[in-house]
């Protein structure tokens, strides 16, 4: 804890005890953060007292000097005159003393009154990354408007009709080059062919403007998507059109239902058909005919075919498709989802009508209610089954998997077509700690359990529902006598890349190993040369570099510069001979197209260098970032500290902790980023600290899995321990420490405040928090907590329930979107009820109508961050100390009368 000599000019109070309301705000040890707040205070005082800078006890003369009961009967005229002269002398002395004290106050290292425009001494003693010590102040509006976001290009690679590698799709408004065109990297990016000449196309008197395009594999047709309407996070409905490249004309996907809203459409690998979903039913349109064939007929509100329901879209596939064509186009695999047993949760919309339907006359003033099939922890899950459709026979069929989990205990997390009608299917139990891999043969209609792993016995952890398995076909001439597949497995406590061959072999060839992890591996495979490309954290958990390794596990080679900190992502061409390499930080991001055909990569073209961003950054004063480690209970955790541009180690700075902290997540990394935390550090002048505690990703399974069954506990310990470490630093004001987060970070904010009980953190800001994990969806929650039926004590412990502990904080803020379909408002309302029952009042709450989890409706996103910033300023200014336990302010004259007449009451 900080010693008293740090602040000898003011009274030291416990961080969890509000100041007496009788004390003046001028001698509060938490007053005065910024010039703006001082000016606002002065405006208020001018309006109420008509005098600035005087102690409140000295201001009553201008307002109440002649008020009845002001003691004039006790004094003669002469004594009154002497008293006035004496009083003015006291006033002048007080004013002078106050001014001197104020000057000393702001020159002795207090960070309260600093704003971005103040000239502070620059610290040149350290070497920190990406800071600029001079320049214009960063504004919140600039951060929110995205002016500091790097420009980036998402390349859509496409395989040529004859197997050509290095082709990519470009779309633009250049009529001369063509609106949608194929460029050939092998020919220096020259246009290989034009698919759409113009950015619009006419169909039966309608002008169609594409919002997205999907060329067929043979590049003779283009699927045009228009009139998109968002459904959930990844899903949408739209109008679909088939565009013919040769004639430059288009027709509806379903000529007999032009206005039907389509949820998904996928090309056959042979380019001769399109599978699509409408109203939760799966259809097939062969291009040889205008006829649309229904594959399923009973889809609707309870049954989904080919598209996921809410929970599978959100928590398993992170996308809008559960439909897969076989490589030869002869079969379609798809998931049937039965939601009939899943309870509904109502989401209300008071200002908007997401359904697009107008209410009946007289019902305009009632909210629209959207009933969502949402399985909460412990509630019935949707039943999922894998089905197949034989295109030639027109038959839907299933293949029994006798060793699979029961319907109410099964999650299908990945489906991969292999060769000759074989399919790899990965499933887990409901609690996601037992993995089963099946090999399904659609020709013999038999299945085989080829791999099973009990992760709970291995390390007490869980299986993440990733979709990264890659089929490797046999090629004896290339040293691959059997089919196989690549998968990420747990190996010696870390996630590593494994090669299983033949398909039914449960013992893999390990391609990587060590105290580091592969990330969504493999990224690409060069089947000709037998090379696997992947991104990994081999250099540091906060970095991402590109590597390659041979299929026998030899010759692991970095392909990016590992001598410098770096964070890279990559997008490969179909044959893995070319790639879009994206450098994302810590310096200004850039993108280049590289060739991987030699022993070393070759840069073919820089497609983005973000020169404008580099010039913009040079004009602004941005925070420095200090990356370091902290060891807690034997675990090494990653920390980044953002310091104000003019950091002065002789000053005392407030500290804001920012976190997300969800299982497997990462917030501390080396990407370039100018965000809300940057604004807080650069323009509000606070230090911002982020620590990825236990439970987060890329630091090994032991640190990640320790949280299972009791999420929030160890994560809070790590936040508190790190905060205590920072509180001891000579440049930190330990009496002004706050923490904030959104979603899981909102939960962690409240859990940390609850566990800390005001000892370290005084303030917190929680946006869209989970407050009881029984309220969140089953697939996510049970992966980390088991079911409530199996772990009732764990759920009790993780809920925000200790109101006395929250009361010990100075104040906290809770924000929630009223129409959040992800983290329901039920969470915050339940917390408020607990606070009410415990008579806890030291909090603020703000709801945003019709906003979902991202809080965007009607300017809400800007308002959220403005609210967070202003609330934080008030916190570190000491406003929440001064507003605690408010009492009516009696007149100065009445207080003077009480001093003169101790018995005065009225």
From Swiss-Prot:
Glycans are attached at residues 338, 629, 797. It is a single-pass type II membrane protein. Residues 1-11 have a biased composition (Acidic residues). It comes from the Eukaryota. The keyword Magnesium does not apply. Residues 107-906 are vacuolar. GO terms for molecular function: aminopeptidase activity; dipeptidyl-peptidase activity; serine-type peptidase activity. Its EC number is 3.4.14.5. Residues 1-33 are annotated as: Disordered. The active site is at 743 (charge relay system), 820 (charge relay system), 853 (charge relay system). The keyword Cytoplasm does not apply. Residues 21-33 have a biased composition (Low complexity). Residues 1-85 are cytoplasmic. Keywords: Aminopeptidase, Glycoprotein, Hydrolase, Membrane, Protease, Serine protease, Signal-anchor, Transmembrane, Transmembrane helix, Vacuole. One of its GO terms (biological process) is proteolysis. InterPro entries: AB_hydrolase_fold (IPR029058), Peptidase_S9_cat (IPR001375), Peptidase_S9B_N (IPR002469), Serine_Prot_S9B/DPPIV (IPR050278). Belongs to the peptidase S9B family. This is Probable dipeptidyl-aminopeptidase B. It comes from Emericella nidulans (strain FGSC A4 / ATCC 38163 / CBS 112.46 / NRRL 194 / M139) (Aspergillus nidulans). The gene is dapB.
């Amino acid at each position: 804890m900080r010693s008293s000599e740090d602040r000898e000019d003011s009274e030291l109070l416990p961080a969890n005890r509000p100041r007496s309301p009788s004390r003046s705000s001028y001698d509060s040890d938490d007053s005065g953060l910024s010039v703006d707040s001082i000016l606002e205070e002065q405006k208020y005082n001018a309006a109420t007292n008509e005098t600035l800078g005087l102690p409140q006890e000295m201001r009553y003369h201008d307002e109440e000097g002649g008020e009845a009961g002001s003691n004039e009967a006790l004094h003669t005229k002469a004594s009154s005159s002497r008293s006035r002269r004496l009083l003015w002398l006291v006033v002048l002395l007080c004013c002078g003393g106050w001014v001197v004290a104020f000057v000393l106050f702001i020159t002795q290292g207090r960070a309260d009154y600093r704003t971005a425009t103040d000239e502070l001494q620059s610290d040149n003693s350290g070497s920190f990354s990406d800071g600029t010590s001079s320049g214009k102040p960063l504004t919140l509006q600039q951060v929110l408007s995205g002016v500091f976001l790097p420009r980036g290009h998402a390349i859509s690679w496409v395989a040529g009709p004859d197997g050509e590698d290095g082709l990519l799709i470009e779309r633009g408004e250049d009529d001369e080059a063509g609106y949608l065109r194929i460029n050939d990297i092998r020919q220096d990016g020259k246009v290989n062919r034009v698919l759409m000449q113009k950015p619009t196309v006419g169909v039966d008197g309608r002008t169609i403007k594409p919002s997205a395009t999907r060329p067929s594999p043979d590049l003779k047709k283009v699927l045009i998507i228009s009139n998109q309407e968002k459904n959930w996070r990844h899903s949408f409905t739209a109008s679909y059109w088939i565009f013919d490249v040769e004639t430059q004309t288009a027709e509806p996907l379903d000529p007999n239902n032009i206005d039907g809203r389509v949820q998904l459409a996928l090309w056959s690998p042979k380019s001769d058909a399109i599978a699509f979903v409408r109203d939760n039913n799966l259809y097939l349109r062969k291009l040889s005919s205008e006829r649309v064939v229904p594959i399923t007929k009973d889809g609707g509100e309870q049954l989904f075919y080919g598209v996921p329901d809410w929970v599978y879209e959100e928590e398993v596939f992170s996308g809008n498709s559960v439909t897969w064509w076989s490589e030869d186009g002869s079969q379609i695999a798809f998931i049937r989802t039965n939601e009939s047993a899943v309870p509904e949760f109502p989401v209300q919309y008071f200002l908007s009508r997401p359904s697009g339907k107008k209410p009946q006359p007289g019902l305009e003033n009632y909210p629209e209610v959207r009933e969502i099939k949402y399985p909460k922890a412990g509630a019935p899950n949707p039943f999922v089954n894998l089905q197949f459709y034989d295109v030639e026979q027109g038959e839907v069929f299933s293949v029994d998997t006798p060793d699979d989990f029961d319907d109410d205990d099964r999650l299908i997390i990945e489906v991969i077509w292999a060769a000759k009608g074989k399919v790899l299917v990965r499933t887990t139990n409901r609690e996601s700690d037992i993995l089963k891999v099946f090999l399904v043969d659609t020709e013999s209609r038999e299945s085989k359990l080829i791999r099973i792993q009990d992760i709970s016995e291995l390390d007490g952890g869980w299986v993440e529902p990733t979709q990264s398995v890659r089929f490797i076909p046999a090629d004896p001439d290339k040293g691959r006598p059997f089919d196989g597949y690549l998968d990420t497995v747990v190996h010696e406590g870390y996630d590593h890349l494994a090669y299983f061959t033949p398909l039914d072999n449960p013992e893999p060839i390990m391609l990587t190993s060590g105290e580091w992890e592969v990330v969504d591996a493999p990224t690409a495979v060069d089947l000709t040369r037998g090379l696997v490309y992947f991104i990994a954290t081999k250099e540091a958990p906060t970095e991402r570099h590109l590597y390659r390794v041979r299929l026998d596990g030899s010759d692991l080679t970095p392909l990016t510069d590992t001598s410098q900190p770096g964070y890279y992502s990559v997008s490969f061409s179909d044959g893995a001979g070319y790639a879009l390499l994206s450098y994302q930080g810590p310096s200004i991001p850039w993108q280049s197209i590289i060739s991987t055909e030699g022993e070393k990569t070759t840069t073919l073209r820089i497609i983005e260098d973000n020169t404008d961003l580099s010039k913009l950054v040079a004009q602004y004063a941005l925070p420095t970032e200090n990356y370091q480690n902290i060891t807690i209970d034997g675990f090494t955790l990653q920390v980044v500290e953002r310091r104000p541009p003019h950091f002065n180690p002789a000053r005392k700075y407030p500290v804001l902790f920012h976190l997300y902290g969800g299982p497997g997540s990462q917030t501390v990394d080396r990407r370039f980023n100018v965000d809300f935390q940057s604004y807080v550090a650069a323009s509000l002048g606070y230090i911002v600290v982020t620590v990825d505690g236990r439970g987060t990703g890329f630091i090994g399974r032991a640190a990640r899995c320790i949280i299972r069954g009791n999420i929030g506990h160890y994560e809070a310990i790590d936040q508190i321990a790190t905060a205590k470490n920072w509180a001891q630093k000579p440049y930190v004001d330990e009496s002004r420490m706050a923490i904030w987060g959104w979603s899981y970070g909102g939960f962690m904010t409240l859990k940390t405040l609850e566990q800390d009980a005001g000892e370290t953190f005084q303030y917190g800001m929680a946006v869209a928090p989970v407050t009881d994990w029984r309220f969140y969806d089953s697939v996510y929650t049970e992966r980390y907590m088991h079911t409530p039926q199996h772990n009732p004590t764990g759920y009790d412990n993780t809920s925000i329930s200790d109101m006395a502990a929250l009361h010990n904080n100075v104040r906290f803020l809770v924000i929630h979107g009223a129409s959040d379909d992800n983290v329901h408002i039920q969470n915050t309302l339940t917390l408020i009820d607990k606070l009410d029952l415990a008579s806890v009042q030291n909090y603020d709450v703000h709801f945003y109508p019709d906003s979902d989890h991202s809080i965007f409706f009607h300017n809400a996103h800007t308002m959220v961050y403005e609210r967070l910033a202003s609330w934080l300023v008030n916190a570190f200014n000491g406003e929440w100390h001064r507003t605690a336990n408010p009492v009516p302010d009696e007149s100065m004259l009445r207080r003077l009368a009480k001093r003169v007449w101790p018995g005065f009451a009225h």
